[in-house]
Every structure is written in structure tokens, then in C-alpha cells.
């Protein structure tokens, strides 16, 4: 018997400073659907998800809520894992970035990049968004009437100055462009690839990869005064889930990752920083990064201030799990933004599930009850036409 071909698929790992919403649920459900289809196609599928638990934003949220950061991480990571289970997502591993196995992976990748000569220590000064956990060039910012700058995401930024390790991202500009040219499928959909290529062609700057103003993170090897920038730590979770350092046989089987499913807002980290880091560490690159769109509510962006953030558990309870999974995968063009509303949900459920599929099932069962004594007919001999259909299905 021939061994099944492997297929490794991941969600991004959501940031554990808040509760999950329908945007997180959408990514979990669509990734699970893709994993199931690959399994039906005969692949040995590894589906990994998890939670990103480090960073300054976690510390600030824990302080506001009167909790320890460890408590916040444990509670919210469990909330994301519980949601994935409630959505009937058949994930194989849930990676928490506070786990010892992940710390070892992140530090090994750092050592390899450092050994390559791609990490150096220097004074950093620039604009930083705590909420985005991202640095921005001033030309990317918008200036408000009061003189304050805001990031492209609409979040406030503050001027940061501290000693920091830097990664030589600028050294990988040509290699990244060559990657996109040779493997245009690396970034999807096509509109996202164009965005990524345009960004890289405008010139890449080395980026800060450590912090000294707090200690909630993975310590930098050889210098405990620094912790890794949260994205350097978080991105390596995909290696952790594949068994890097902990299970050589598993890693050889499933790496490189076949498909990273992520939100379009974190495409830069996955399509630029991540492959550059892997090139530096001499680790094979993933095959594809796909950036899906956002889920809006009544065509408006979800916002706590507006009060339109939807708890996925409420939708499961109100409509049912199968209906919820069907709605989001049928209603939203994959790769583009979509919108949820009660009216759209009810209309889609009634039109497709109750009327079309429901009527088909009802009529089929009625015919079986009437003509086959209520039992499924047993297939005795296949015709040549039947054999042709079976062959076509097996070769698909």
C-alpha cells in the first residue's frame, strides 16, 4: 500500500489579549473545510492552530483587567481552543507560544539567523503601535488635527527609543522578489501578491526584532536583557506544530507547510518577514500564503465602540453549527471581504439548505420509502457508465 501524500495547513495564531470574534471563527472554519477536502482527496493532513501569547499588549491588557499576564494568556488561549472545538474544527495541534517546546524552536531559529550574520545590535528609534505590535515608517502614518500620528490600521503610535537587535531584511529584497517571480502561487490571492511585490520593490529596511522595555516574551539567546519581538516569536509556531526539534520524522513528513491561511492585515509578516527569516535560517519555505478578507457586520467594520462585535458562540446557539459553517463558506467569496447580517443568514439558509438541499433530500427519501421499502437500494452490478464515473472521481 502506497503511503499517503502529506498536506500541512495552518491558521494564523490569534493574539490572546481578547476574546475571539466571528473573524477568528471564519478563519478556523474555512481552514478546517480545506483540511477536510484534502483528507477526502487522500492526503495525510496535519492541521495546526494555536495562540500568540507574548508581547507588550498582553501585559497592558492583563494590568487593565487586574490579572497576571500568565492568567490572561491561559484564559484566552483556552477560549480560542474551545471555540475551535465548538466549531467542530478537527485540528491536530494547538500551539501556545508560552510552551517550552515553542521557546526552544524560536531560540534555535534566532541562533541560526545570528550565525548567518543577519542579526546585529543597534539603537532603535521610531514609531511603534502597541496594538498592532508593529513598527511603521513615518511615511506610512497619517497625521491627525491634534498633530498625533496614527498607523494605517487606525491605531495610535508612539515614539520608541531603545537598544534593539535588528534583522537584515534589506539583504533579502532581491531573493524575495525572485521568489514571487518564480513561484507566483506563493502569495494568494493575486491582488495580495501584487501588494506584497509593490511593497518589496519600494525597498526594505532592516527591522527591530527585540525589546528591552518589558520581559514578557522569549528571551534572546545569550542576552536575557532582551526578549524577542512578538512576531519573530509567533511566526515560528508553524515550525513548532510540524515537530521542528521535537520530532524529526514528523517534521520531515510535513514540512514545508503547504498552506498558511491568514488575515489580509498580517500579510506583510507572513509573505515578507517569514520567508526572509527562513532563508536566513536555512529552512525550506512554505509553499503558499493565502490572505483572506475581513468579516463585517451589516457591511460595517466590527468595533467595540460601535457595539457590533459578534460572539461566534451566539451564532451557533441561534442558528446551529452546520448552518453557520455553510453560511460563511457560501456567502463570502474567498479572499475578499464579506458581511454578516441576520437577514442574509436567514435568506441563505432558507434558500439553499431548506429549499434546495432540503427538498432534494425529502424527495429522495420519499422515493426510497415508496419504492424500496424504506431501505437504501443495494448496488449489485455497476454498468460501464458507472465504472467511468468511479474512475473519474478517483483520478480527480
Show which residues each predicted segment covers.
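Structured secondary-structure scaffolds
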Residues: 2-43, 48-49, 101-105, 124, ...
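Short, charge-patterned binding micro-sites
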Residues: 51-57
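Acidic, turn-prone loop/beta-hairpin segments
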Residues: 52, 372-395
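A charged helix-plus-loop insertion that forms the helical arch/lid used to bind
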Residues: 61-74
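A glycine-rich helix N-cap at a beta->alpha junction
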Residues: 73-92
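Short metal-coordination and nucleic-acid-contact micro-motifs, chiefly zinc-binding Cys/His arrays
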Residues: 123-125, 144-147
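Short cysteine-rich clusters marking metal-coordination/redox-active sites
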Residues: 129-132, 149-153
Amino acid at each position: 500500500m502506497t503511503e499517503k501524500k502529506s498536506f500541512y495547513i495552518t491558521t494564523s495564531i490569534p493574539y490572546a489579549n481578547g476574546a475571539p470574534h466571528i473573524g477568528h471563527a471564519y478563519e478556523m472554519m474555512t481552514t478546517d473545510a480545506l483540511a477536510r477536502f484534502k483528507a477526502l482527496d487522500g492526503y495525510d493532513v496535519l492541521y495546526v492552530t494555536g495562540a500568540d501569547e507574548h508581547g507588550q499588549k498582553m501585559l497592558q491588557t492583563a494590568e487593565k483587567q487586574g490579572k497576571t499576564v500568565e492568567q490572561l494568556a491561559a484564559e484566552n488561549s483556552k477560549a480560542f481552543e474551545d471555540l475551535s472545538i465548538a466549531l467542530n474544527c478537527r485540528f491536530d495541534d494547538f500551539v501556545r507560544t508560552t510552551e517550552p517546546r515553542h521557546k526552544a524552536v524560536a531560540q534555535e531559529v534566532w541562533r541560526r539567523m545570528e550565525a548567518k550574520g543577519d542579526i546585529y545590535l543597534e539603537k532603535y528609534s521610531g514609531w511603534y503601535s502597541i496594538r498592532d505590535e508593529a513598527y511603521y515608517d513615518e511615511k506610512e502614518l497619517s497625521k491627525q488635527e491634534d498633530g498625533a500620528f496614527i498607523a494605517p490600521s487606525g491605531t495610535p503610535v508612539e515614539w520608541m527609543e531603545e537598544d534593539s537587535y535588528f534583522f537584515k531584511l534589506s539583504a533579502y529584497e532581491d531573493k524575495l522578489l525572485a521568489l514571487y517571480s518564480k513561484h507566483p502561487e506563493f502569495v494568494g490571492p493575486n491582488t495580495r501578491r501584487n501588494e506584497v511585490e509593490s511593497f518589496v520593490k519600494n525597498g526594505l529596511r532592516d527591522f527591530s526584532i527585540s525589546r528591552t522595555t518589558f520581559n514578557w516574551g522569549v528571551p534572546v539567546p545569550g542576552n536575557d536583557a532582551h526578549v524577542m519581538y512578538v512576531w519573530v516569536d509567533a511566526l515560528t509556531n508553524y515550525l513548532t506544530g510540524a515537530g521542528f526539534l521535537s520530532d524529526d520524522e514528523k517534521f520531515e513528513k510535513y514540512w514545508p507547510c503547504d498552506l498558511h491561511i491568514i488575515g489580509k492585515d498580517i500579510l506583510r509578516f507572513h509573505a515578507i518577514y517569514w520567508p526572509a527569516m527562513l532563508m536566513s535560517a536555512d529552512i525550506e519555505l512554505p509553499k503558499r500564503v493565502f490572505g483572506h478578507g475581513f468579516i463585517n457586520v451589516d457591511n460595517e467594520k466590527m468595533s467595540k465602540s460601535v457595539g457590533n462585535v459578534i460572539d461566534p458562540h451566539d451564532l451557533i446557539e441561534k442558528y446551529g453549527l452546520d448552518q453557520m459553517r455553510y453560511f460563511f463558506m457560501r456567502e463570502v467569496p474567498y479572499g475578499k471581504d464579506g458581511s454578516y447580517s441576520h437577514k442574509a443568514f436567514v435568506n441563505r439558509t432558507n434558500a439553499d439548505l431548506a429549499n434546495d438541499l432540503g427538498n432534494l433530500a425529502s424527495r429522495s427519501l420519499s422515493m426510497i420509502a415508496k419504492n424500496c421499502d424504506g431501505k437504501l437500494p443495494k448496488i449489485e452490478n455497476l454498468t460501464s457508465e458507472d465504472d467511468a464515473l468511479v474512475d473519474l472521481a478517483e483520478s480527480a
